Swiss-Prot record:
Signal peptide: none annotated. Keywords: Aminopeptidase, Hydrolase, Protease, Serine protease. It is an enzyme of class 3 (hydrolase). This is Putative Xaa-Pro dipeptidyl-peptidase. One of its GO terms (biological process) is proteolysis. Its EC number is 3.4.14.11.
């Protein structure tokens, strides 16, 4: 293979090329000392509906890398100038040598330049009485910025560039070398990636520097863009799609946070994401705020974190408000035009599965091409690369591979590898029907679940104590700190598909209480090699003070009974023959809720309590209840 290396002293060639291609100087210098391939190649190469790896594109020595700043339509940092987002581009040399125009895989993130890491010293103290203002928290540690120009990140490059795609990264507002402030949701986190897509399609301005600089054009872009990413990086593609920006053809969000209220609250209750007790939206702001100089950071901290987030997040009541409304992408989903492949896990207790299910359902209703990939693991986990390939190849290269036809739901079964999902026409399973079961008393031991309601009023009482983990309470044979009701052993496996729903009539001896509900599979598997699906079926949480409205808490009248009804997290799981399905009701969930002083009593009226289970086939096969 012929390699041509220009002399260092051939600066006339360098700057002539820079002017012609409108590239940053750094990028052209990189190109100037890089080898050049001879002969033209065909891009893309498609086989069986997928873009294939092209040998000539695998060698990173033949990639062009450069960075730039794209101008947005907002000024968050108060300097009187429109904020610019830091963007990096990695593309095949053939975009210059053959003047190719290629589609783009775009990934945006607030994490590229670093975070506060595992330091949780500045998190909120969960030891808080319900309804009280939280104790003051500590200041967050400084972020040691990572990354060097022109490379922001190398994620996705090896997967997609050799298949004939340009890969683009950008840092979110207020992070890395992007200007502005983090807003953690809200308009700017949608408008920032929109600006980058507009630049890729020739509608927005790009520059070689964060201030001033020479114009940069994406002359190598075909104007067709796909986005993907996981967690926060999966939220941003959805945010961009809600703007309806032209050129964004397809997104594959993985475990996206689609509502910051649903991330930090649950049915009016302050409920932390799994593994991050004490985190709230202001904590996440500090976690990612790696951008700006000292003066800019102070401005952002004051005007965004303190005046907006800390003033409106409301850790005292957990109520919904306009601040949270503006950070819920379901409220903007009507703007989505791009095709969407949602990916999530049913046992993700960080970003719980409702985040993707609610968007999937709304997009289906709106007639947007959408499919769902779900697995049985925890947070993260993209679809198989072959599935993603088919989506990107279809929507970005126009290949008629039938990806939009056929099954709409792809679910990895309990014992299968994530690369081998099972196809279903839709989610939930079309044959799933609600089966209602009712509790029979047994406290402080275990009661039963049966398919007939009680004919006489019976109550049982539990005593709140956050000291005990939910896993401990579920396994306990005898405790006053939870109520638990189980089916008889299943005579056949039961396939749950959909969203369980709980109805409770309860009274409390205090004006406020946490309410937690778990569905569990018993007996509990205590083996070291147990899987998460062996024990936890699903969970849910709610604030009894928000029975009438999510926007306004009303103190409970001690001793008065209230009816409360809410969804648990969506699921699709097969409960094995011989297991029992258990409904556990308790108050404070040690790993998720606030930790008020123990001792609050919740009394449940069993005659007016029921659980609705979405069962494929519509029946639960039970052994004799005698």
């Amino acid at each position: 293979m012929t390699k041509l290396v220009r002399s260092r002293l051939d600066l006339t060639w360098v700057f002539t090329t820079m002017k012609r291609l409108r590239l940053p100087v750094l990028a052209v210098l990189f190109l100037a000392i890089s080898p050049v391939q001879g002969g033209e190649i065909q891009i893309p190469v498609i086989k069986d509906g997928e873009a294939q790896v092209i040998k000539e594109l695998e060698d990173s020595d033949y990639w062009i890398r450069h960075d730039l700043w794209v101008e947005t339509e907002f000024d968050l940092d108060g300097d009187g100038k429109l904020d610019r987002m830091h963007v990096s581009v990695t593309r095949p040399t053939q975009t210059d040598t053959q003047s190719l125009k290629l589609p783009v895989i775009y990934n945006s993130s607030p994490y590229f330049a670093g975070t506060t890491g595992g330091d949780e010293s500045y998190f909120w103290d969960a030891r808080q009485e319900l309804g009280d203002e939280p104790p003051k928290r500590s200041a967050a540690p400084a972020i040691e910025r990572e990354g060097t120009r022109p490379i922001i990140s190398k994620r996705h490059v090896k997967d997609w560039l050799p298949r004939g795609f340009v890969v683009v990264h950008s840092s979110a507002p207020g992070t890395g070398l992007s200007q502005g402030c983090p807003t953690v949701g809200d308009d700017p986190e949608a408008l920032a990636p929109k600006a980058v897509i507009d630049w890729l399609c020739g509608r927005a301005k790009g520059f070689t520097e964060p201030f001033g600089g020479e114009p940069v054009e994406a002359y190598w872009s075909s104007g067709k863009v796909g986005m993907t990413g996981t967690s926060y990086n999966g939220t941003i593609p959805l945010a961009a799609a809600t703007t309806g920006v032209e050129g964004l053809e397809v997104i594959i969000p993985v475990a996206p946070n689609t509502s910051y209220y649903h991330y930090y609250r649950s049915n009016g209750l302050v409920r932390h994401p799994g593994g991050y007790l004490g985190e709230d939206i202001d904590i996440l702001y500090d976690f990612i705020h790696s951008g700006g100089d000292e003066e800019t950071r102070a401005y952002c901290d004051c005007h965004i974190r303190d005046e907006q987030m800390m003033a409106n997040q409301d850790r005292a009541t957990g109520d919904y408000n306009d601040f949270w409304y503006s950070r819920d992408y379901l409220n903007r989903v009507d703007g989505v035009k791009a095709a969407v492949l949602m990916a999530h896990a049913f046992n993700d207790w960080n970003v719980v599965p409702e985040h993707s299910i609610r968007i999937y359902e709304a997009l289906k209703k709106n007639g947007v091409e959408t499919q769902l990939f779900m697995h049985q693991g925890g947070h993260g986990g993209p679809p198989p690369i072959s599935m993603m390939n088919r989506w990107f190849t279809h929507y970005l290269y126009g290949e008629d591979n039938g990806v939009e036809k056929g099954s709409k739901s792809w679910i990895v079964r309990e014992k299968d590898e994530r690369t081998k999902p099972t196809e279903y026409p839709q989610y939930p399973h079309p044959e799933a029907k609600d089966v209602v079961v009712y509790p029979v008393p047994g406290a402080p031991q275990r009661g039963r679940l049966q398919t007939a309601p009680l004919t006489e009023p019976i109550t049982e009482t539990l005593v709140d104590n956050f000291s005990f983990a939910g896993e401990t309470l579920a396994q306990a044979e005898y405790t006053e700190h939870r109520l638990i009701y189980t089916t008889p052993e299943l005579s056949e496996a039961v396939h749950l598909s959909g969203t369980p729903r709980i109805k409770l009539r309860l009274a409390c001896d205090r004006p406020a209480a946490n309410l937690s509900v778990w569905l569990v599979s018993l007996p509990w598997n205590t083996q070291k090699n147990s899987k998460i699906t062996d024990n936890i079926i699903t969970r849910g949480w709610a604030d009894p003070q928000n029975i009438e409205s999510m926007r306004e808490s009303k103190p409970l009248v001690p001793g008065q009974f209230y009816d409360i009804e809410f969804d648990l997290q969506p699921d699709d799981q097969v409960i094995a023959k011989g297991q029992q399905i258990g409904l556990m009701v308790f108050s404070s969930d040690r790993d998720y809720t606030l930790h008020p002083t123990p001792g609050t009593k919740l009394t449940i009226d069993l005659q007016h309590t029921q659980l609705s289970l979405p069962v494929v086939g519509g029946t639960i096969p039970l052994e004799s209840q005698d």
